[in-house]
From Swiss-Prot:
Protein name: Protein SLOW WALKER 1
Organism name: Arabidopsis thaliana (Mouse-ear cress)
Phenotype upon gene inactivation: Embryo sac development arrest at two-, four-, or eight-nucleate stages, associated with abnormal nuclear numbers and positions in embryo sac, aberrant embryo sacs and unfused polar nuclei. Disrupted progression of the mitotic division cycles of the female gametophyte leading to an impaired synchrony of female gametophyte development. Reduced root growth and accumulation of unprocessed 18S pre-rRNA.
Primary location recorded for the protein, binned into one broad class: nucleus
High-level lineage: Eukaryota, Viridiplantae, Streptophyta, Embryophyta, Tracheophyta
A molecular function (GO) term: mRNA binding
Tissue specificity comment: Expressed in cells undergoing active cell divisions, including functional megaspores and the female gametophytic cells. Accumulates in roots, stems, leaves, inflorescences and siliques.
Keywords: Cell cycle, Cell division, Developmental protein, Nucleus, Repeat, rRNA processing, WD repeat
Subcellular location: Nucleus, Nucleolus
WD repeats: 50-89, 91-130, 133-173, 176-216, 220-258, 262-304, 320-363
UniProt-listed Pfam families: UTP15_C (PF09384), WD40 (PF00400)
Function field: Essential protein required for nuclear division and organization during embryo sac development in female gametophyte, probably by promoting rRNA biogenesis essential for the progression of the mitotic division cycles during gametogenesis. Involved in nucleolar processing of pre-18S ribosomal RNA.
PANTHER family given in the database record: U3 SMALL NUCLEOLAR RNA-ASSOCIATED PROTEIN 15 HOMOLOG, UTP15 U3 SMALL NUCLEOLAR RNA-ASSOCIATED PROTEIN 15 FAMILY MEMBER
Protein's GO biological process: cell division; embryo sac development; megagametogenesis; rRNA processing
């Protein structure tokens, strides 16, 4: 009995230490909905007509109502961003590869595989400018963010061209890429800065103000670069090549900040999206059919969405209300944010009183100058996000000699500026008179007192380095043309004596400098040989 009790006791202890559990079954994974996923899920799909061929490029107008330009085959179609219906079509001779809007939304530029860049008015079908210089297919075209007069384009000839649109001429050819140039972008903070990406695996940073082929910085992505975009700060850029997206710090010397390799196939397009929280996200699409949202501040993919076709292009409206993605089979996947029923945190209530107030508002008589409310209109109006700030032009205050020049009273303008005794202004007026070919005529018409002021000015400043290039030649001309008036006048003797002394002193200084140069030059040559 004792042994049987001991065995039962041991069995009881074992059952407590190792309790029997039912087999666990797989449960559906329920991800908690984040504000990020709620934001991107709020885009409601809209049906758009399928296009004939691959959608090569998408671009939204930067101004309200943010028209959409879609490049497909040899056509650019304009769509309304509100109804997503086609409003106008523009035809090209070859397949369109890129399209972009000007900062005011009045014009757009597009390039095709024939190497031609064309500029259109959105209300006209005829091209305003046709820019021909690329010797191979043109792959991208961009307007600077605020510059309305220039364009940047690049193509398979490996050349980046900076255009003067008004003159339809190339200002500078930026040479440096060793393979096809496929993408580029302009800085959001400096209209002269731009970046370009190439199939030679590099991204180059250029300054359009320097009319040479020397780039400012070079970044090696490691794979053929398909797209490059500036991030809103202007100090960071994002590059897409292969299945990776990388963020680089230009201010920090081109150092890589982070890398994302969540796509399975080549990334084809990048865009920057502005969230409701005023934060920015990097959005990418790829041939694997996925759209990825990347928080580059935390180096984390925050949202992913699958589409039933390889994706070629991406467009996001500036107001964040529309998202458009172009597929390789001509499909356009458009999404618009759902209209919320909540305004200011409270739901709209459709009661009888609101309906009556709406009717009363519609029946109110038009305001006229005879009504008191006419003079109070707009006082309580608050600015909206789509309003334009128009700066009042400040009136330019002209000096007396500027006013005289506007009236073509040349001699009076010269005498007036001589009386001010400001050498920089005097030389500026003289240069203007030289451009008008009136300087010597003014000198020949001067009275004795006015001629004395001119000689006094020449005596004091003709040897000053900043002004000597103009004043030395003018002094010689004045002495030759007014020699008879100067010789017999006692009041001019002192001025001529001082002028002669200044010129002789300048000659001695020049001779001394030449002697010093003669001594130093052989020593420099000897030092260079050793």
């Amino acid at each position: 009995m004792e042994e049987e009790l001991r065995v039962r006791l041991n069995d009881h202890q074992v059952s407590k230490v190792f309790p029997v559990k039912p087999k666990s079954t797989a449960k559906p994974v329920s991800e908690s909905e984040t504000p990020e996923s709620r934001y991107w899920s709020s885009f409601k799909n809209h049906s758009t007509p399928n296009l004939v061929s691959s959608v090569a490029a998408l671009a939204f107008s930067p101004v309200h109502p943010h028209s959409l330009a879609v490049a497909h085959s040899a056509t650019v179609s304009l769509f309304s961003s509100q109804s997503l219906s086609s409003s106008r079509r523009f035809s090209f001779r070859d397949v369109v590869s890129s399209v972009c809007f000007r900062s005011d939304g009045a014009l757009f530029a597009a390039c095709d595989l024939s190497g031609v860049v064309q500029v259109f008015d959105i209300k006209e079908r005829m091209a305003l400018r046709t820019l021909r210089s690329h010797s191979a297919p043109a792959r991208f075209v961009k307007y600077p963010v605020q510059d309305k007069l220039h364009l940047v384009s690049g193509g398979d000839d490996g050349v980046v061209k900076y255009w003067d649109v008004a003159g339809a001429t190339v200002i500078s050819d930026l040479l440096g890429h060793k393979d096809y140039v496929r993408c580029g972008d302009c800085s959001p903070v400096n209209d002269s800065m731009l970046v370009t990406g190439s199939y030679d695996h590099t991204v180059k940073v250029w300054d359009a103000r320097v009319h040479t082929s020397n780039w400012i910085a070079e970044i090696n992505h490691g794979l053929p670069v398909e797209d490059v975009v500036y991030l809103p700060s202007g100090g960071l850029i994002a590059t897409a090549g292969g299945n990776s997206v990388k963020v680089w710090d230009l201010i920090g010397g081109g150092k890589m900040v982070c890398s994302m390799e969540s796509h399975n196939k080549t990334v084809t397009s990048l865009r920057v999206a502005r969230m409701e929280s005023a934060e920015s996200r990097l959005v990418s699409v790829a041939l694997d059919g996925y759209m990825k949202v990347f928080d580059y501040g935390r180096a984390k993919v925050t949202y992913s969405m699958r589409f039933p076709a390889p994706l070629m292009s991406l467009g996001l409206s500036p107001d964040g209300s529309t998202r458009v993605i172009g597929g390789s089979n001509g499909m356009v996947f458009a999404g618009k944010k759902k209209v919320r029923d909540v305004v200011g945190g409270q739901k709209k209530s459709l009661n009888l009183w609101s309906l009556i107030s709406d009717v009363d508002e519609s029946r109110r008589r038009a305001l006229r100058p005879t009504y008191f409310r006419y003079f109070q209109r707009g006082q309580s109006e608050k600015p909206s996000k789509d309003d334009y700030l128009v700066k009042e032009k400040k009136g330019l205050k002209l000096t007396r000699h500027d006013k005289l020049l506007k009236k073509f009273r040349h001699k009076e303008a010269l005498v007036s500026v001589l009386e001010e005794k400001k050498p920089a202004n005097v030389v500026a007026v003289m240069e203007e008179l030289v451009a008008r070919r009136k300087l010597m005529k003014c000198v020949s018409n001067m009275e004795e007192g006015e001629l004395g002021m001119l000689l006094g000015f020449l005596q004091r400043y003709c040897t000053v380095q900043r002004y000597s290039g103009l004043l030395m030649g003018l002094t010689k001309k004045v002495l030759e043309t007014r020699a008879e008036d100067i010789k017999g006048k006692n009041e001019f003797k002192g001025l001529l004596r001082n002028l002669k002394r200044e010129v002789n002193q300048e000659i001695r200084i020049q001779q001394s400098l030449l002697e010093i140069q003669g001594v130093i030059a052989p020593l420099m040559r000897i030092a260079g040989r050793s």
